[in-house]
């Protein structure tokens, strides 16, 4: 097995036994990037020199007895998290020259853990999209089929892990932006509970929905990555001070007797392809064979999720993105008057999808429409939260598909925003309710395209969904398959 193909767990064993060095591992990953990046276009920035320096530092720490799980491990970061001294563009022209003067809390924690950050990955502009086609700079391709999307908005991170261009990666999930690309690229994608991981230094899209989470080759690796970044942070007012369990130990516990709920509304929705349904049905049988009890649950307000999300998220985006006006930082189009400068800067700096969502959000918040749109959406969001609360009184986790279809063709839905929005129909509700969710590879379509299984857990119950996912992977081999590049 080539070094770039290793899981984090495997690489850690080899690093601790001195079989390999972090410099060997990092060079192998950088060589892999050089070989396949021209095909995949997963990265916006590759930090070769900084990565090799970090690897050298990690090797010194390992020689002195350091045993931190991520010491010397090459990781990629979605270009929406602030990295001191390294471009952070959010895949937008308006931030095309922005170099943050500080690190996001998650980045600080990863550096303290000895991780080697190899680069920043492509994404939909400001994390608005489901295909990574909304980037101002490049279009990322799915490593399993280069004519298809990797999903979005964290498509660059998912594609980088799938193509072995890093051992793990981080993204952000506002409506499915980690889980959906995880499903489309056959990697594990975890959205933690809202407040579990600090959002300090995460460039905001929708502040009540955004959450940082990991991509990995295995559930065990995802647990290691979550362990490194989870925890309370006073710099983030939405961070919650809840004890962080030992995820890597918790996932080893038996799943026998655990209860998993099937929301009938998810399986009755239109658009679910037979391949996806069959793969998820088979995954459910696999868990049942391990002693998991599967039962029906109801999430009756699921049918309103898309409508609610596409009022609340654009409304928050309209407010958050008002700061990009050409005055303090980022791109500026010089004009004679201040108003003309604002208009020119924002018109040329933001792409069409971002402009669309700002307009929708501004409309939903405007006088005369606030109660009818934003107010009503907020009320229905509360009902969605109540649905989850009732469901989790009966079960430990909720099981469903991640997406109704496998990855679609590049360009197939770019002129049809509604079809694009509906690709997140099974993932949006977890963000609206603030619960955790994970995508685990569970099969392939007749065309050889990856399919993911979604497990959702109650607030701060990540160890339960990770345990189920880990035991599912012990019984299957979907996660061991890699695309031919």
Curated annotation (Swiss-Prot):
Disulfide bonds, paired cysteine numbers: none
Active-site positions on this chain: 78 (charge relay system), 153 (charge relay system), 177 (acyl-ester intermediate)
Keywords tagged on the record: ATP-binding, Ligase, Nucleotide-binding, Protein biosynthesis
Entries under InterPro entries matching the protein: Amidase, Amidase_CS, Amidase_dom, AS_sf, GatA
Catalytic activity: L-glutamyl-tRNA(Gln) + L-glutamine + ATP + H2O = L-glutaminyl-tRNA(Gln) + L-glutamate + ADP + phosphate + H(+)
Top-rank taxon, per record: Bacteria
EC number: 6.3.5.7
GO molecular function terms attached to this record: ATP binding; glutaminyl-tRNA synthase (glutamine-hydrolyzing) activity
GO process annotations (BP): translation
SUPFAM superfamilies in the cross-refs: Amidase signature (AS) enzymes
Cellular component annotations (GO), alphabetically ordered: glutamyl-tRNA(Gln) amidotransferase complex
Matching Gene3D superfamilies: Amidase signature (AS) domain
Similarity-based family: Belongs to the amidase family. GatA subfamily.
Record note on quaternary structure: Heterotrimer of A, B and C subunits.
Protein name, entry field: Glutamyl-tRNA(Gln) amidotransferase subunit A
Source organism (scientific name): Desulfatibacillum aliphaticivorans
Name of the encoding gene: gatA
């Amino acid at each position: 097995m080539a070094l770039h193909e290793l899981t984090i767990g495997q690489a850690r064993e080899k690093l601790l036994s001195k079989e390999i060095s972090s410099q060997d591992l990092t060079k192998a990953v950088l060589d892999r990037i050089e070989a396949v990046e021209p095909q995949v276009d997963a990265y916006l920035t590759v930090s070769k020199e900084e990565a090799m320096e970090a690897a050298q530092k990690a090797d010194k720490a390992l020689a002195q007895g350091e045993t931190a799980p991520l010491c010397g491990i090459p990781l990629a970061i979605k270009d929406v998290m602030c990295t001191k001294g390294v471009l952070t563009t959010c895949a937008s022209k308006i931030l095309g020259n922005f170099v943050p003067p500080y690190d996001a809390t998650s980045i600080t924690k990863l550096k303290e853990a000895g991780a080697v950050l190899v680069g920043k990955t492509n994404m939909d502009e400001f994390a608005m999209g489901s295909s990574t086609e909304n980037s101002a700079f490049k279009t990322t391709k799915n490593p399993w089929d280069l004519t298809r999307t990797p999903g979005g908005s964290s498509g660059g991170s998912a594609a980088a892990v799938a193509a072995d261009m890093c051992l793990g990666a981080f993204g952000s999930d506002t409506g499915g932006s980690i889980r959906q690309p995880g499903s489309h690229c056959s990697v594990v994608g975890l959205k933690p509970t809202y407040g579990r991981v600090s959002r300090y230094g995460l460039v905001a899209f929708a502040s009540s929905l955004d959450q940082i989470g990991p991509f990995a080759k295995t559930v065990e690796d995802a647990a290691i990555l979550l362990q490194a970044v989870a925890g309370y942070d006073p710099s983030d007012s939405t961070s919650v001070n809840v004890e962080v369990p030992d995820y890597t130990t918790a996932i080893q516990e038996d799943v026998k007797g655990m209860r998993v709920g099937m929301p009938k509304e998810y399986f009755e929705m239109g658009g679910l392809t037979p391949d996806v349904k069959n793969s998820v049905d088979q995954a459910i049988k696999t868990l049942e064979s391990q002693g998991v009890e599967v039962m029906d649950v109801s999430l009756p307000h699921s049918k309103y999720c898309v409508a609610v999300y596409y009022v609340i998220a654009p409304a928050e985006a309209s407010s958050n993105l008002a700061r990009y006006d050409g005055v303090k930082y980022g791109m500026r189009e010089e004009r004679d008057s201040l108003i003309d400068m604002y208009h020119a800067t924002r018109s040329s700096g933001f792409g069409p999808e971002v402009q669309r969502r700002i307009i929708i959000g501004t409309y939903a918040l405007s006088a005369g429409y606030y109660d009818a749109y934003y107010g009503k959406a907020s009320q229905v969001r509360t009902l969605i939260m109540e649905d989850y609360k009732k469901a989790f009184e009966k079960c430990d986790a909720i099981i469903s598909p991640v997406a109704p279809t496998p990855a679609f063709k590049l360009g197939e839905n770019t002129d049809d925003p509604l079809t694009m929005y509906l690709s997140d129909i099974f993932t949006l509700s977890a963000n609206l309710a603030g619960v955790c969710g994970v995508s685990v590879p569970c099969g392939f379509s007749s065309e050889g395209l990856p399919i993911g299984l979604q497990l959702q857990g109650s607030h701060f119950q990540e160890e339960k969904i990770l345990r189920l996912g880990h035991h599912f992977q012990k019984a299957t081999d979907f996660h061991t398959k890699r695309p031919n590049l």
